[in-house]
Amino acid sequence: MSTYVREKVLRIPMEHVDLTYIKNSIKQKFPDEDYEYDFTWYLETAFPDVFDYATVGKFQVAPTEEPFFDYVLEHEWDADGEYGRTRALIRIEREKYLPIFQQIDPNINMDYVRLVEFCWYNGTEAPDYYDDTKDPFYDEV
């Protein structure tokens, strides 16, 4: 059943992740299969300690049209509304989460990682929030 879902994630576009390590690991575990057909399933099967959809503390392929990896910080079912906001990480956050992102790319550039909080109706694709946005709620009144 569809409902509103709220997530707070650390998001990076797949184009900024060197997928060589991930793809080689999948090829070793599934040598005769076309993993491109269902990339998410192969990720979750080959890396069960790292990837699992909608699981706090794990990566997921974002439920968006554009290809992102999300590291899930918070996930809540039966949330309210549709919104999204994003910002760049500050230096201390980039340092804190670097070891986690190095699990998917040892040479990851944390400058491409964004903190994204969004809520959407999960009967549809989630919006592609990534670029820094300013929430008008914080504008001076």
Predicted regions and their residues:
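Short, extreme N-terminal segment that most often corresponds to the first beta-strand
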Residues: 1-38, 116-125, 137-141
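Charge-rich, solvent-exposed alpha-helical interaction surfaces
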Residues: 21-25, 29, 38, 42, ...
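Charged interaction segments
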Residues: 50-141
